[in-house]
Amino acid sequence: MDILSLGWSALMVVFTFSLALVVWGRNGF
């Protein structure tokens, strides 16, 4: 695995986590 795909996968994980966090916050957990 090269550094570019590693960076992209890390970015997708952070994006998905923040999106889920926003949804949870909007629903009041």
Swiss-Prot record:
Described function: Component of the cytochrome b6-f complex, which mediates electron transfer between photosystem II (PSII) and photosystem I (PSI), cyclic electron flow around PSI, and state transitions.
Gene Ontology cellular component terms for the protein in this record: chloroplast thylakoid membrane; cytochrome b6f complex
Signal peptide start and end residues: none
Chief subcellular location: plastid
Locations listed in the record: Plastid, Chloroplast thylakoid membrane
Gene designation per UniProt: petN
NCBIfam families: PRK14747.1
Subunit structure: The 4 large subunits of the cytochrome b6-f complex are cytochrome b6, subunit IV (17 kDa polypeptide, PetD), cytochrome f and the Rieske protein, while the 4 small subunits are PetG, PetL, PetM and PetN. The complex functions as a dimer.
Family under the similarity heading: Belongs to the PetN family.
Protein name (Swiss-Prot/TrEMBL): Cytochrome b6-f complex subunit 8
